[in-house]
């Protein structure tokens, strides 16, 4: 789970602050492909001549997944997303496991004292991802236009830091960053240099699902406010709503339905009815969002159960 709930409730355990010190050597990469469906774990030092990154394999679209606070690179929701990406679109999926820096060892105690440490670690992990991207581009000749980052919670901001760093390294921009309910605590007043921002990739898509644990302002080219972005159907805990962003995207990848975003100017305005949606005004959440011309804020109605469709049969 990626659970910041007690941080907001102020019920901090005043025990010993956990040690979530970042060390690049602790990072593992879980790599999934059609012939490695259950994933294999790699360390950075063997990446330079790893046969999985042959030309045939590396020519595919690549998705780099980045988890959040208290989580791991092979958490069940990311595992389901990785499998959907390889099954449906034959992606090469690389999930960045920075669990020590994300305080996963303390997840069972729901200890949030390490949160500020984890926040600080996001920049280091972002740099790691950018350096790994440099290897893909320079050694394996992967075009930047083939690489997208998908980050949940703190992982969304980490993706933003990676996006800034690859530009600093003169590699260009990632094709896309998808921020899944980007973390709110410690980022509530942050400006672009210190969080995920629409300039961090060619296209930045944000899916907002919890106003308590996520940011409640626009960060992307498109910002989807699912069920108004406050909380999600069927969820009583903020952590459930926070995690729903991952599940929604996985269903969108499976293409069983289009979660339609309809223009929504501000919290005090009424969104345009889905029935009035056209391809040039509304946007489908997911990997093809970039193919729609509209930008800005969108309200997304959803059902309680997967595949969460609530689009009145409208086809965009």
Curated annotation (Swiss-Prot):
List the propeptide region positions: 5-14
Q: Which residues form the signal peptide?
A: 1-4
* Reactions it catalyzes: a 1,2-diacyl-sn-glycero-3-phosphocholine + H2O = a 2-acyl-sn-glycero-3-phosphocholine + a fatty acid + H(+)
This protein's GO CC annotations? extracellular space
Q: Which Gene3D superfamilies match?
A: alpha/beta hydrolase (3.40.50.1820)
Active-site residues annotated for this sequence: 153 (nucleophile), 181 (charge relay system), 242 (charge relay system)
- Where does the record place it? Secreted
Keyword rRNA processing listed? The answer is no
UniProt superkingdom: Eukaryota
Keyword Lipid metabolism attributed: yes
Summed up, the tissue specificity of this protein is: Expressed by the venom gland.
Question: Belongs to which family?
Answer: Belongs to the AB hydrolase superfamily. Lipase family.
What this protein is called in its record is Phospholipase A1 3
């Amino acid at each position: 789970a990626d659970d910041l709930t007690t941080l907001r409730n102020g019920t901090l355990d005043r025990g010993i602050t956990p040690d979530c010190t970042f060390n690049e050597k602790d990072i593992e990469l879980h790599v999934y492909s059609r012939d490695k469906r259950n994933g294999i774990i790699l360390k950075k030092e063997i990446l330079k001549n790893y046969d999985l990154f042959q030309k045939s394999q590396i020519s595919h679209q690549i998705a780099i997944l980045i988890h959040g606070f208290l989580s791991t690179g092979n958490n069940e929701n990311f595992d389901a997303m990785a499998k959907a990406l390889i099954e449906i679109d034959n992606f090469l999926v690389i999930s960045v496991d920075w669990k020590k820096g994300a305080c996963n060892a303390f997840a069972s105690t729901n200890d949030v004292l390490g949160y500020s440490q984890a926040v600080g670690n996001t920049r280091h992990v972002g740099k790691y991802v950018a350096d790994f991207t440099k290897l893909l581009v320079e050694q394996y000749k992967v075009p930047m236009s083939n690489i997208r980052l998908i980050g949940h919670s703190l992982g969304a901001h980490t993706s933003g830091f990676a996006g800034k760093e690859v530009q600093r390294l003169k590699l260009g921009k990632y094709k896309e960053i998808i921020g899944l309910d980007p973390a709110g605590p410690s980022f509530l007043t942050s400006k672009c240099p210190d969080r995920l921002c629409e300039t961090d990739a060619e296209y930045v898509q944000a899916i907002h699902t919890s106003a308590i644990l996520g940011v409640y302002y626009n960060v992307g080219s498109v910002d989807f406010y699912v069920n108004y972005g406050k909380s999600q159907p069927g969820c009583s805990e903020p952590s459930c709503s926070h995690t729903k962003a991952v599940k929604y995207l996985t269903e969108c990848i499976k293409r069983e339905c289009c979660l339609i975003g309809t223009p929504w100017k501000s919290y005090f305005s009424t969104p345009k009815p889905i029935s009035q949606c056209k391809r040039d005004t509304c946007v489908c959440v997911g990997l093809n969002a970039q193919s729609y011309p509209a930008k800005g804020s969108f309200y997304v109605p959803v059902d309680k159960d997967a595949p969460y469709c609530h689009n009145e049969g409208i086809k965009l």
